[in-house]
Swiss-Prot record:
UniProt keyword terms in alphabetical order: GTP-binding, Hydrolase, Nickel, Nucleotide-binding
Protein name from the UniProt record: Bis(5'-nucleosyl)-tetraphosphatase PrpE [asymmetrical]
Swiss-Prot/TrEMBL cofactor(s): Ni(2+)
Any Pfam family hit: Metallophos
Gene3D superfamilies associated with the record: 3.60.21.10
CDD domains attached to this UniProt entry: MPP_Prp_like
GO MF entry, a single one: bis(5'-nucleosyl)-tetraphosphatase (asymmetrical) activity
The enzyme's E.C. designation: 3.6.1.17
Catalytic reaction list: P(1),P(4)-bis(5'-guanosyl) tetraphosphate + H2O = GMP + GTP + 2 H(+)
Protein species of origin: Bacillus cytotoxicus (strain DSM 22905 / CIP 110041 / 391-98 / NVH 391-98)
Amino acid sequence: MKYDIMGDIHGCFQEFKTLTTKLGYNWDSGLPIHPEKRQLAFVGDITDRGPASLQMIEIVWELVIKQKQAYYAPGNHCNKLYRFFLGRNVTIAHGLETTVAEYKALSSNEQAIIKHKFIDLYEQSPLYHILDNNQLIVCHAGIRQDYIGRADKKVQTFVLYGDITGEKHPDGSPVRRDWAQNYTGNAWIVYGHTPVKEPRFVNHTVNIDTGAVFGGKLTGLRYPEMETISVPSSLPFVPEKFRPIS
């Protein structure tokens, strides 16, 4: 099977549609379908900050759950939205407020439908995907070599948030270790979470979060070709979001 793996979309539906079209997907049915049966995979964070988070939920639910033609690994924003929909006490900030505003603008019936779809998508999706006979791992923030095959709390924290040190940058964002430098496995790990100006290949890992929602690009990785394709963001560029990997 051949895959096209999408970086963090964050509600940037138009960029997603443009990128998938560029990758050869046909939207005539209202969904991106590839004539050669390539399948999409998502590294998570499909919502928050961008203008069309609910549209992304609809599309990804349809592809992953109903059609079973795509793969989705949840990100930290997905986890927080899931907890919001469960009625947990979460802080509506850091992008969640845009998704909640879209949600609150719906009728109660429409709210019930989108809430059900996202909970369904989240609960039916694994923490990360191991594909192509263990040669490809799709996850949100990466995964350490010795964590592959596990899904305990420690692994969940790593996969959703990265290799956090517990320290904070001046803007409040967490300091993360560069785990990819220590990866020696043969399987390709494709992930996002930390915005980079260009796709970042280190050992057999690649970060494809090129900051679409921060005015960068939306990037897709063609696997097994290992070719990246990007489309520019329509949103304003926010340079401070593209921090050097420490």
